[in-house]
Each structure stands twice: as structure tokens, then as C-alpha cells.
Curated annotation (Swiss-Prot):
It comes from Methanocorpusculum labreanum (strain ATCC 43576 / DSM 4855 / Z). This protein is involved in the repair of mismatches in DNA. It is required for dam-dependent methyl-directed DNA mismatch repair. May act as a 'molecular matchmaker', a protein that promotes the formation of a stable complex between two or more DNA-binding proteins in an ATP-dependent manner without itself being part of a final effector complex. This is DNA mismatch repair protein MutL. It comes from the Archaea. It holds the Pfam family MutL_C. PANTHER family: DNA MISMATCH REPAIR PROTEIN MLH, PMS, MUTL (PTHR10073), DNA MISMATCH REPAIR PROTEIN MLH1 (PTHR10073:SF12). The keyword Plastid does not apply. One of its GO terms (cellular component) is mismatch repair complex.
């Protein structure tokens, strides 16, 4: 007797439904996407729940609707109006196309489907009632144009799937996330989400990205974003990303990416976004990103996953590069201080001050009112550190340089911008950004290093000695020239041109440690070397500065390409607006 049997239609339907309908959010996704494809302008989603779980789901739209016959045909497996031949799969522009959703949902729930075709002269709409895949009724009723789908008793005939549904709050969170993602990709449509009859979420179909982001995440969050846009041949990118220095998260939960209007998940594109941030992104942190990517539909294969959340791109590397470039360009054009002209400050005045002139001590807001003579020697060393980065040509900047007010704890610079907002600057992080940018600009050039008058011998560990020969080219690109001088002893003959003190043994050991961490990737090794060198050569915290020195430091910071973060991604600057201060003091 044959053990191989052809499955009956009911079993086949349940298997298919298991692939398409995982939870309540899956039902919402399929029905809302159908409404989007139906040219709806308003989509209302209703969720009802009690202690047992989600009990009802409804989706109502004002789309094109269906006639009496199509309403019934839509529940047949693989019945669709969106494709008709294999060639159509090569250029899909709709969110749905397989003709599986309604049949799969109807197989594991009780469905009431009401629809009226747009522009129909008939006053009647079609209503189809199906329970567990079995047709209960097909009748004419009165209803407005568009479509309304009511799902009752989800998974009532599949107890195994119902058993594995999570708590109501968890399932609701998945529904909210799904609706929010679709709304972010379809900003010209108004979405309304109700839970147990109460409105929980609404967008207004204005077409504006900031409007939808504000509706989903709040107006405060939307103000922390900066726009991204770019055209790279057939690839077009538009959206918003977290401004450097704003709140980041340790998880990747705020990547909202769409390709040709379809929300997708892509680790490759998430990686490209983070690469676009580069040193502006703190280690281990993730930005928020809302990006629309438009491609030729023929370059996108959406028929690779049951839920269509994953897609395959024929030109994936090119798209990744475009995303990375768009993010990078946006971040380096962003300005958060001011676009007003800088105050007149002759460059000659900055670069020709005698080293021994250190200026008057500044008020210290931490409580000390005077600086003792014993602190003047460190001030002279500080002056030398500041001049290392002033010796290079500074690019012109249209940014207003904040006016220095004082210093807190010999570590933070207080200033105010043109709008009167309070600016707090970490002096070490700021100077580190300046130094890193200058080291990076000189790297791999003949101007990267300067020979020491007296070469500096340094004794290395066995590990350092073994690794150093493979690192010499990278170190040379950074400005370091080291030559062997006996067993485990090397002679430092050249250091980065911005600072001769970068040849001291402690700094060399720190740089070698950083380089060893990045062995195998030349660019990463060089970047680590430059970051370490920058950190070691600049003004530290707990260092008193004069008003003049702080003003010069801010001017140098404003002239960098990325003034808002240090090379490691930590913020250099915090802006306390007047409105934010008012809120902190509970002023209305």
C-alpha cells in the first residue's frame, strides 16, 4: 500500500496559512498592504482584545474596491489582479502579488469581507462570509465604496498556532510596529489605528516624512533628525537619520528601510548606514534611520520570502555604496550651531601670538575664582598643544563661533550661540576631533611626518617586535618612521608633523597596541593609529584654559568637517536650548 498521499485542500490551506500568517500582525500587514495597492487614501485598522488575546481585527479603506464576482474569486488560492504571467515577476510594483493572503487568512479564521467598486452605479456592495475556508454566504448589502475586512476568531481551528501567541501587549506591539512601518513608507495615505475602540495612532496623509515620524515617535524625537537625499544614477535615496550627538540606541530596532515603497529588512543596508556615520557613531550604538530607496523594479526580487520582508538586489553593492555616500554627505553638510557669519577674527592674530603669552585666567564656574602661579607652567604647555593644530591651514567656515562664557571643572567649555542657547563643549573631545582631522588630511602624503632632531630609542615587547614589520607601511602613512636598532629595540626617527611629542615611548606603545587590534585591515589599522595619536597629543580634561584659548579652540572645531563628535563617536558638544532649560525648570 502506498505511503505517499496527496494532501487534501484543507490541509494544504493550513500549511500555506502557516507560512503567511504567523500572528495578528501578519494579518494586519497583508490586509493593509492590499488596501495600499487598492489606491486607498484613508485606511482604518481596528484591534479588539480581552484577557484571552486579540479577538478581532478590522481593516477598512476607501480604495477601488471589487465587483460582486471578484469579491468571491479573491478568496481562491493564487487569485490576484496584480500579475498574470511569469514575466510580471521581473518588475513588481505592488506590495502584494501572489494571491495567497486572503485565502490563507480565511483558512484559519472567520472572515466577513464587504466591498464596493469605486464608481459603481449599483447602490449595493458585495459581502462574502467565510469560516475556516468554507463559504458561508455571498450576498449583496448596502455599503460605501471601498473595502472592509473583519477577522474574527483568528487561529480558532489551529490550536497549535493559537497556543504560541504571546501576551496581548506583545502582540499589540507587533501590530503597532507593522502599521508604523507601512505608514512611514506610504506618507500620502492617512492611517488610523484603534484599540478597543480608542484611537492610538494616526497619520494625516500629508506626504511629509517629518509629519509621519512625529506622529509615530513624537515631535521631540523628530527634531533630532537630519535629512538624507541623493541620486546616484538609477538609485534614488530620501529620508531622515539621527543627527550626531542625539540619542542613540544599543539595538538595531529603529532602522526603517523601504525599497520601492516596500518595508524591508537588510543587514547589508544597515551596515551601509553605520559606515556612512563613520567616527560620528559611538561604538556599540545604532542610529535611527528612515530611508526610502527607489530602484528599477527589475533590479529587485521580492519573491524570495513568504512575508516579502527580505528582498534580493541584483546590484546590492552599488546600492550599499549609494546609501553610505548619501548618509556621509548628509552628516557632513549638517550644521547645528548657526549659519550666521563668523565674527571678524583675523587668522594672523591667531597664528602669530607668542607662545609665552597665555592670556588671563578665566572665571571657573566650579567655584575657584583665581589661578595660582603654580598653574602657569601647565598653561604654557597647553598653549603649545593648541598651536599644534593652529599651524595648519584652517578651512573657511560659515558657522558662527559660539561666544565663550567660561570653563567648568577645567574640563568643559561654556559658550552661547547666536540664538542664546547654552553650549557645553568637552575640550578634550573637541581638540581630539581637530587633531584627528589634520592627521587624516596629511596621512599617506610626504607631509605626514617630521624627522626628529634626536631619534628616540624604544624597547618593544616580543609581541610588538614580531608584529611591527607588517605595520611599518601603515605607521609611515601616519607619519611614523621606525628602524630596527638591535634586539627588541627600535629607533623612532619621524613622528606626525603636528607634534614632536608623539614620539615618546608611552605614545608609541599605545599606538602599537591600537594597530595590533586592527591587524588584517590596512584602513582600520591606520584609523586606529590616527585616533590614538590624536588622543595623546591634545589638551586633556582637568586643564585650565584662558578665554582666548577656548575661543580659538572653538574656532578650530567649527572649521572641521565633523565638529559634533570626537573620532571615537562621542559627542564634543551638547546644546541646551532655552526651551529645554525652561522645561528643566518646569517653566511653562
Amino acid at each position: 500500500m502506498s505511503r505517499v498521499k496527496i494532501l487534501d485542500e484543507e490541509t494544504i490551506s493550513h500549511i500555506a496559512a502557516g507560512e503567511v500568517v504567523e500572528r495578528a500582525a501578519s494579518v494586519v500587514k497583508e490586509l493593509v498592504e492590499n488596501a495600499v495597492d487598492a489606491d486607498a487614501q484613508i485606511i482604518r485598522i481596528g484591534i479588539s482584545a480581552d484577557k484571552t488575546g486579540i479577538t478581532k481585527i478590522s481593516v477598512t479603506d476607501d480604495g477601488i474596491g471589487m465587483d460582486f464576482d471578484d469579491a468571491l474569486l479573491a478568496f481562491r488560492q493564487h487569485a490576484t489582479s496584480k500579475i498574470s504571467r511569469p514575466e510580471d515577476l521581473d518588475g513588481i510594483t505592488t506590495l502584494g502579488f501572489r494571491g495567497e493572503a486572503l485565502a490563507s487568512i480565511a483558512a484559519i479564521s472567520k472572515v466577513t469581507f464587504t466591498t464596493k467598486e469605486r464608481g459603481s452605479p449599483s447602490p449595493e456592495a458585495a459581502r462574502v462570509v467565510i469560516h475556516g475556508g468554507e463559504l458561508i454566504s455571498h450576498s449583496a448589502v448596502g455599503a460605501p465604496e471601498g473595502t472592509s475586512v473583519l477577522i474574527d476568531a483568528l487561529f480558532y481551528n489551529t490550536p497549535a498556532r493559537r497556543k504560541f501567541q504571546k501576551s496581548v501587549p506583545t502582540e499589540l506591539s507587533h501590530v503597532y510596529d507593522m502599521v508604523e512601518r507601512i505608514a512611514l513608507s506610504n506618507r500620502n495615505i492617512s492611517f488610523v489605528l484603534l484599540y478597543n475602540g480608542k484611537e492610538r495612532f494616526q497619520t494625516f496623509g500629508t506626504g511629509s516624512y517629518p509629519d509621519v515620524i512625529a506622529a509615530v515617535f513624537g515631535s521631540t524625537f523628530s527634531k533630532e533628525l537630519t535629512p538624507v537625499s541623493g541620486s546616484f544614477g538609477p538609485v534614488k535615496i530620501d529620508g531622515w537619520i539621527t543627527r550626531p550627538g542625539s540619542e542613540m540606541k544599543t539595538t538595531q530596532t529603529r532602522f526603517y528601510l523601504s525599497i520601492n515603497g516596500r518595508q524591508v529588512t537588510s543587514r547589508q543596508l544597515q551596515w551601509a548606514i553605520r559606515e556612512g556615520y563613520g567616527t560620528l557613531l559611538p561604538k556599540g550604538m545604532y542610529p535611527a534611520a528612515f530611508l526610502d530607496i527607489v530602484l528599477d523594479p527589475r533590479d529587485v526580487d521580492v519573491n524570495v520570502h513568504p512575508t516579502k520582508r527580505e528582498v534580493r538586489l541584483s546590484r546590492e553593492r552599488e546600492v550599499m555604496r549609494c546609501v553610505q555616500d548619501a548618509v556621509y554627505t548628509s552628516l557632513h553638510e549638517e550644521r547645528v550651531f548657526s549659519t550666521a557669519p563668523m565674527p571678524t577674527l583675523a587668522r594672523e592674530t591667531i597664528t602669530t601670538l607668542p607662545v609665552e603669552i597665555v592670556g588671563e585666567p578665566v572665571p571657573v564656574y566650579a567655584g575657584k575664582q583665581e589661578m595660582h602661579e603654580a598653574r602657569q607652567a601647565p598653561l604654557k604647555q597647553t598653549e603649545k598643544q593648541l598651536r599644534r593644530t593652529e599651524s595648519a591651514d584652517l578651512p573657511e567656515t560659515d558657522l558662527f563661533v559660539p561666544e565663550v562664557l567660561g570653563q567648568i571643572g577645567d574640563t568643559y567649555i561654556l559658550a552661547k550661540n547666536e540664538s542664546g542657547d547654552l553650549i557645553v563643549v568637552d575640550q578634550h573631545a573637541a581638540h581630539e576631533r581637530i587633531m584627528y582631522d589634520q592627521l587624516l588630511a596629511r596621512s599617506s602624503s610626504a607631509e605626514a611626518g617630521q624627522e626628529l632632531i634626536v631619534p628616540q630609542p624604544i624597547t618593544l615587547s616580543k609581541k610588538e617586535t614580531a608584529a611591527l614589520p607588517d605595520l611599518l607601511d601603515v605607521l609611515a602613512a601616519a607619519g611614523y618612521l621606525l628602524e630596527p636598532f638591535g634586539k627588541d629595540v627600535w629607533m623612532v626617527r619621524s613622528v606626525p608633523v603636528v607634534s614632536s611629542t608623539l614620539g615618546d615611548p608611552d605614545t608609541i606603545h599605545a599606538i602599537l597596541d591600537a594597530a595590533l587590534d586592527g591587524v588584517g585591515n590596512t584602513d582600520e589599522v591606520l584609523d586606529r593609529v590616527l585616533k590614538t595619536a590624536a588622543c595623546r597629543a591634545v589638551v586633556k580634561g582637568n586643564t585650565p584654559l584662558t578665554i582666548e584659548q577656548m575661543q580659538r579652540l572653538l574656532r578650530q572645531l567649527m572649521a572641521t568637517k565633523s565638529p559634533y563628535t570626537c573620532p571615537h563617536g562621542r559627542p564634543t558638544t551638547i546644546v541646551l536650548s532655552k526651551s529645554r532649560l525652561a522645561g528643566m525648570f518646569l517653566r511653562t
